[in-house]
Amino acid sequence: MQTIPSTTETAADFDAVIXGAGFXGLYALHR
């Protein structure tokens, strides 16, 4: 884990939440 959160990582996490159980969401969570 990085000490400084990246903007892309935050956006991916937010997208995962929107996505929910969607494939994109799972991909973002795995990534």
From Swiss-Prot:
Keyword Flavoprotein applies: yes
Domain of life from the UniProt record: Bacteria
GO molecular function, one term: monooxygenase activity
Keywords for this protein: FAD, Flavoprotein, NADP, Oxidoreductase
Catalytic activity as recorded in UniProt: 1-hydroxylimonen-2-one + NADPH + O2 = 3-isopropenyl-6-oxoheptanoate + NADP(+) + H2O; (1R,4S)-1-hydroxylimonen-2-one + NADPH + O2 + H(+) = (4S,7S)-7-hydroxy-4-isopropenyl-7-methyloxepan-2-one + NADP(+) + H2O; (1S,4R)-1-hydroxylimonen-2-one + NADPH + O2 + H(+) = (4R,7R)-7-hydroxy-4-isopropenyl-7-methyloxepan-2-one + NADP(+) + H2O; (1R,4R)-dihydrocarvone + NADPH + O2 + H(+) = (4R,7R)-4-isopropenyl-7-methyloxepan-2-one + NADP(+) + H2O
Temperature dependence, free-text field: Optimum temperature is about 36 degrees Celsius.
Flavoprotein in keyword set: yes
pH dependence: Optimum pH is 9.5.
Top EC class of this enzyme: oxidoreductase
EC number: 1.14.13.105
Role of this protein: Catalyzes the NADPH- and oxygen-dependent oxidation of the monocyclic monoterpene ketones 1-hydroxy-2-oxolimonene, dihydrocarvone and menthone. Is able to convert all enantiomers of these natural substrates with almost equal efficiency. Is thus involved in the conversion of the monocyclic monoterpene ketone intermediates formed in the degradation pathways of all stereoisomers of three different monocyclic monoterpenes, i.e. limonene, (dihydro)carveol and menthol, which likely make R.erythropolis able to grow on these compounds as the sole source of carbon and energy.
Assembly information from the UniProt record: Monomer.
Protein name: Monocyclic monoterpene ketone monooxygenase
Organism placement in taxonomy: Bacteria, Bacillati, Actinomycetota, Actinomycetes, Mycobacteriales
